[in-house]
Amino acid sequence: GCVICIDLKSFYASVECADRGLDPFTTNLVVADPDRSANTICLAITPAMKAAGVRNRCRVRDIPPGIEYLTAVPRMKRYMQVSGEIVGSYLELVSPQDLQVYSIDECFIDAAPYLRLYRTDARTFAKHLMRRAFEVSSVTATAGIGPNMFQAKVALDICAKHASDGIGQLDDESFQRGIWFHRPITDIWGIAPGIAPRLAK
């Protein structure tokens, strides 16, 4: 099998930047309701803010005082619209039965039949899907590729971060070599802090 898991990077913040003609990789922008207190949780921050050391889903008061940033009011209807447009662009290439929407900014695609159909390989196909997402939304995507949903998701969460092209790829061998001993194990999809100590034994 071949599954591709696609994630839209800092989705809410990236949509807000795209709608303003700004680059989320160079723009400090926070999605949070400014009418609430400094205890308000930031729903999203741009990659530029992450690079400056700001943690995702922090409170507004936790942003270091030296960092200047724009604040965007959350617009869930707009994010759902953009998400729908992106999924629509994928559905021009794959059948609905082979696409599973996991969340507003993430989906799984059973790519195996399409690699034969389009005479391509998984990495090239993932790049094509990522490019389509960017063309319709100006939002950058990352991807994980694996023989099943679990390994594709782990490839996305752990390997794609360090890949220059934003694509992580795992097979059974590289999973055992690279993920088996990965710590903290809570980085791995489905392993919550409560179960981690038992699994670590």
PLM regions and their residue ranges:
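Residues that scaffold, gate, or flank divalent-cation-dependent active/transport sites
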Residues: 1-108, 113
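Helix-hairpin-helix
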Residues: 7, 105, 143, 180-201
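Short polybasic/polar patches that bind polyanions
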Residues: 50, 135, 200
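Short loop/hinge segments at the start of secondary-structure elements
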Residues: 94, 100-102, 106-140
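Short, structured patches in soluble enzyme cores that scaffold and shape functional sites
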Residues: 111-113, 145-147, 193-195
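Long, highly charged, low-complexity intrinsically disordered interaction regions
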Residues: 121-187
